[in-house]
Amino acid sequence: MMEILRGSPALSAFRINKLLARFQAANLQVHNIYAEYVHFADLNAPLNDSEQAQLTRLLQYGPALSSHTPAGKLLLVTPRPGTISPWSSKATDIAHNCGLQQVDRLERGVAYYIEASTLTAEQWRQVAAELHDRMMETVFSSLTDAEKLFIHHQPAPVSSVDLLGEGRQALIDANLRLGLALAEDEIDYLQEAFTKLGRNPNDIELYMFAQANSEHCRHKIFNADWIIDGKPQPKSLFKMIKNTFETTPDYVLSAYKDNAAVMEGSAVGRYFADHNTGRYDFHQEPAHILMKVETHNHPTAISPWPGAATGSGGEIRDEGATGRGAKPKAGLVGFSVSNLRIPGFEQPWEEDFGKPERIVTALDIMTEGPLGGAAFNNEFGRPALTGYFRTYEEKVNSHNGEELRGYHKPIMLAGGIGNIRADHVQKGEIVVGAKLIVLGGPAMNIGLGGGAASSMASGQSDADLDFASVQRDNPEMERRCQEVIDRCWQLGDANPILFIHDVGAGGLSNAMPELVSDGGRGGKFELRDILSDEPGMSPLEIWCNESQERYVLAVAADQLPLFDELCKRERAPYAVIGDATEEQHLSLHDNHFDNQPIDLPLDVLLGKTPKMTRDVQTLKAKGDALNRADITIADAVKRVLHLPTVAEKTFLVTIGDRTVTGMVARDQMVGPWQVPVADCAVTTASLDSYYGEAMSIGERAPVALLDFAASARLAVGEALTNIAATQIGDIKRIKLSANWMAAAGHPGEDAGLYDAVKAVGEELCPQLGLTIPVGKDSMSMKTRWQEGNEQREMTSPLSLVISAFARVEDVRHTLTPQLSTEDNALLLIDLGKGHNALGATALAQVYRQLGDKPADVRDVAQLKGFYDAMQALVAARKLLAWHDRSDGGLLVTLAEMAFAGHCGVQVDIAALGDDHLAALFNEELGGVIQVRAEDRDAVEALLAQYGLADCVHYLGQALAGDRFVITANDQTVFSESRTTLRVWWAETTWQMQRLRDNPQCADQEHEAKANDTDPGLNVKLSFDINEDIAAPYIATGARPKVAVLREQGVNSHVEMAAAFHRAGFDAIDVHMSDLLGGRIGLGNFHALVACGGFSYGDVLGAGEGWAKSILFNHRVRDEFETFFHRPQTLALGVCNGCQMMSNLRELIPGSELWPRFVRNHSDRFEARFSLVEVTQSPSLLLQGMVGSQMPIAVSHGEGRVEVRDDAHLAALESKGLVALRYVDNFGKVTETYPANPNGSPNGITAVTTENGRVTIMMPHPERVFRTVANSWHPENWGEDSPWMRIFRNARKQLG
C-alpha cells in the first residue's frame, strides 16, 4: 500500500524566479509556480498512530518555508519507474534505523503547480521538459500515479540467440538490437566459438563478451598493430608507453596490472583505530602512493551531473580496489567542452554550430557536471585539489582541411592519489573455494551498456541505448564500502581481502570474470544471490547493469565471519554470490528458473580475440599565419581574460571540499585573498609529518590541430613546470598518468595519435627520466548530427591530458604565485628560447584563428635543467613566488601573480624582442620566479649552472599598489589597474555563478573582488599560540577518553581524533551501529565529539536523519540524555555533528535557544577559508580565546542559522550563547557573501549551552589544527595553528 505525505516547499524564491524567466524566454506564458516535496511510503503493513506520527516527523526537515494550498495544474516529477533514487535508498535506511520496519521504501517527488495562460499540449510538454531530467526522472499528472514507482514485476527469463538455426545473421541482428558494438571479426570469432561448443549463445553471454571486449575495456587501438603510410610500425601504442617504465622503473612498485599504479612513498605515522579496542594511534610505516586518472566522457555528455559524479566515484573505487585494498586521499577533476555561450555574456569568438538532440550543451555540462563531480568527492570525503577547464569549438583549417573541431563530446577527467601499505601492493592468491563477494549497493536496471556505448561516436548509437548507459550516484554508499576496505587493510597480515576489483563498465559481467581470471581461477555463481532492488530484471540486466558503488572481492571461507562483522558495523551491504574454482570456467546458475544463463570457458570470453590492425595515412596541417591586422594589446588582454580556459575558476573550486582529511597542504586558493591560481596540489603524507604527495596537470590540446607531437610534448612539459613548485628532488620521483582522447578513424588522427604517443613514450619521457605507469584512452571523440538538411560532425582535437604525481620531501616549501612587495625582482625563465610562437594559443582562439607554428619543447636538456634548478632553489628557500606560463602567455602569468599578491607589477619586455604581442601572449614553456633583490645575482648564477643562462630575463618587480604596467625600453606597451584586470578575469565565474546559484550572492562576491582596499585574511589573537595549556595534564599520564562519534556517511572523524589525540586524549572510534547494537555505551567516556560529513547523504535534512535515529530509539536516546546530564562531561559537534546536535535540543540541558542549521543562502555547498571571531560565551572549549580573529575551514551546504523569529534571535544573543561569528577582512561581523558563506544572521556560526559544556559549530577546527593544513597562514606560526587551543582547552577542563 502507498501512503502520500506532503513535504516542505522545494524551491527558494530565486529558484522560482529563474524558472519563470526560463519559461518567459521560451514564450511560455507561465504566471506562477509553487513547488513542494511529496513523499511516498510503500508500506508492507499499516502503521499505528505512534508510528504514523514518527514517520510524519521524520519527513519534516529543511528550512521553515511557508507551505500553502497549491493552485494550478499539477506536474509531478519523480524518479523514473523501475529505478530507485539515491534519496530513496538513504531515506529508507533512516526509517529502518528508527524502527519503522513496515516501510519497504520511501521515495520523493516534487509537485509543481503551474498557473499559466492557455497552453497547447506541445507547450505543456515544453514546460514539463524544463522541470525534469529525462535521463533520470519522469512526469506524472496526479499524485496517485506515483504508485507506478512501487510496481514489482516478475523476474524475466534469459533469452537465447538462434545461431545454430539462423547462422551469422542471428549474431548481426543481436549486435544491433542489444547495442553490442561488435566488429565483424568479433562476430566471426563468436560464431566459431559457440559452434564449437555446439549450442546457441544466451543474450547475457553475448552482452558480457561485448562489454569485456569493448574498446573501453580492452583498449584495442592501443594494443593494435600499426601500418602508417604503407610501413609496418615496430611497436604498438601501449608498448611505447611501457617503454617509459622499461627505461625508468625507479620508485615504481606496480604498473599496468592493477586498478591504479603504485610508487614509493614516505615512512610516516598512519593514523587509525585498533580493530579490537577502537583506540586511535599512529602506526609508523611506509605510506606508498597510488595514482589513477579516468575519464567519463559519454555519460557526462548525456546527463552531466550523474555522468561526472559516477566518473569521480568510479575512479575513487579504482584507488580503493588497488592491491589488497587501499585508501583514496585527494582528487583532481578536469573538463574540456565546446563554447559556453553564456546568455547575455556571449563572446565574439563563440559561434553556434548546432549539436545533436541527445546530448546537452556545453553550458549545461559546465553548470551541472562540476557540481556532480564535486558532490561525489564532498560526500565521499575526498578533497578535490586541482584540475583544468578548457573550452574549444571552431571551424578551422587543420590536417583534414576546413572542419568543425571542438568538444561536443566532452572530456570529463577524474583522478587522484591514495595510500597503500607495502604488504598490500600486490594482489593475493585466490584459493580454490574462496568466497566471491559483491560489496556495495543492490543491482538496479541502470547504466546498461556503458562500456560499449562509450566506445562509439556520439550519435552512432540509438538514443534509448544512450539513455540506458547513464548511471546514478550514491557516494554515501561508496563511503560505507570504503570504511570496510579501510578496516580490512588496517588489519595488516590479517586482512581478509585476497583480491579486489571495482565494478565499472559492464557491471558484474566484466568485474567477476576479471577477478577470477586475474587470480588464475574460474568461478561458479548463483544469479539470485546478487542483491537486487528490482525483481523484474532479466538475468542479463542483473549481471550486466552498471549500478555504482560496488566492488568484487575474494575472501577465504574461514575469514568470512570477520568480513561479515566489519560490513555489519559499517552497514555496508554485501552478498556472497559464488565460489572460486580450480577450472578456469565461468558458470552462472539461476535458482528462480533453475537454468544456466552462462556456461563458458573463460578463454572464450577473455581469450585471444582478433587483434586489430590500423592501416592509416599521415596528414600534415598547413595552418595560416595569424592575421594580426585588427588585434590591439588592450583588446587582446580583455578577450583573453574572458576566455574560460584562462578566466578565474572560482565557480569550479568553491563547490568542492578542499580541507577534509586535515592533510591538505596546498589547495587551489592562494594567499590572504584566496585567488584560485595554485600550480599544483600538495597533501601531507600523514597527520604527523611534513612529507607529502603532489599532483599537477598538463594539457595543450588545441596545439594538436597544428602538430600532434608538439601538443603531447607540451602536456608533459606543462605538468612538469606546474609540479616543480614543490620540493620533490630527483625527477625520477615524478610519475605520470597519460589520458589520451582521440577521434579514431577520422582522417589523419590515427597517424597523429601514433606520432604523439611516440613523441612522449619513446623520446621525451625517457630523455627526462619520467615514467608513465598508468593512463587511459577514449577513442571515440566525435559527435554526428543532422542540422536541417546538412550532416554535421564535431571532432575533438587529439587531447592528451598528463597528470603528474610525486612524493614531496617537505610540503612547507611549496611555492605559490602570490607576489611579495618586499624589495624583489621578477625573472622570466623562457624555455621557448625566444621562439614566441602564437599558433593554437588563447590569443589565436579569441580572434577565431588557428595560426601556423605552435609552441613546443625546444630543448629537452634545458627542460630537465629547469626542473633541477627549481628543485635546488625551492630546497634553498631562495624563491618568493613561482607561476608557470601557459594558456594566455606571460601576460596572464604576471596578472595572476598580481591578483594573488594584491599588488602592482612594473615590468619591461624589451629583452623579449620587438614583437610585443608575441612576447606577451605566446604559450611556450617556462614561467616567472620572484626573488629577493639581494638574491637575484645568486639565483641567476645558479640557473646558469643548470644550462639556463640564455633563457633567463630580468623583467622588473612587484610593487605595492594597483598599477599593472608593461613597458619596452620605458615606452608603455600596456597599462591598466590591477583591479580592472581582476574584474575582467572574474566575469566568467561571476556569470556562471549567477546562472547556477543565488544571483544575489554571486553579485556580492563579484563586488568584493573590485574592492582594492580589502586587506585580505588576517589574524588577531588574544592568546599565545605557542603555549600548550594541556602540557601539565598530559604529563600526569592520564588520557581521558573521547568518543569520536560517526554515523554512516560521516567523513571527518580521523582528523578529529588526531586533534584530540594531540591534546592528550585517548580517542575511541564509535559508530552509531555500536550504540544501537549495544556493543558500546557512552558511560565510559568523559567527552563526546560528533564529526562532520554527510550522514545518510544529508537526506531528510543535514544531520536530521542522524538525530532522529537517536531520538526515536529509546535505549540510545537514554544513553545520550544521561551523558548530557552527567556533570564533568564535554561535547563538541562540528558541521554535520553540529547539525545533528542542534536537533537533540530536547536532550541537552541549556540548549533550548539553539537554532537550526538549514540550506545556505547561496543554495550551494560552500567550501571556503573564512575569518571568524571568538565571542564572549560560556563555552569551555573556547576559554581564553575571546576576541581572537582567525581563518578556519568551512565546508557545508546547510550551515545557515535559522531562528523562529526576531525574539528567538534576541534571546540567543542576550543569553550570550553565540560562540563564533563570521567577520569580514576588516574585522566586522558580517552577513555579506562570501565572508559569511551561508548568510547566517549576525554572522552566527557556533553556539554553546548555558553551562558551556556542549558547543556546536559549523566550521572545522579539526581540519586546520596543524598550521600546514591552512590554505594561508602567517609565516611565524609553528606546528600548531591557533585552533589547537580548542582541544587543549578540552583537556584542561577535564583536569
Curated annotation (Swiss-Prot):
One of its GO terms (biological process) is purine nucleotide biosynthetic process. PROSITE patterns: GATASE_TYPE_1. Gene3D superfamilies: 3.40.50.880, Phosphoribosylformylglycinamidine synthase, linker domain, PurM-like C-terminal domain, PurM-like, N-terminal domain. The active site is at 1135 (nucleophile), 1260, 1262. It is found in: Cytoplasm. Changing residue 683 to W: This mutant shows a disturbance in the secondary structure of the protein and causes a 30% loss in FGAM synthase activity. Mg(2+) binds at residues 679, 718, 722, 884. SMART domains: GATase_5. It is an enzyme of class 6 (ligase). Changing residue 1263 to A: This mutant is structurally identical to the wild-type protein. Residues 305-327 are annotated as: Disordered. Changing residue 209 to W: This mutant shows a perturbation of the local environment, however has a secondary structure content and a FGAM synthase activity very similar to the wild-type protein. It catalyses: N(2)-formyl-N(1)-(5-phospho-beta-D-ribosyl)glycinamide + L-glutamine + ATP + H2O = 2-formamido-N(1)-(5-O-phospho-beta-D-ribosyl)acetamidine + L-glutamate + ADP + phosphate + H(+). HAMAP family: PurL_1 (MF_00419). In the N-terminal section; belongs to the FGAMS family. PANTHER family: PHOSPHORIBOSYLFORMYLGLYCINAMIDINE SYNTHASE. This is Phosphoribosylformylglycinamidine synthase. It comes from Salmonella typhimurium (strain LT2 / SGSC1412 / ATCC 700720). The lineage of its organism: Bacteria, Pseudomonadati, Pseudomonadota, Gammaproteobacteria, Enterobacterales. The gene is purL.
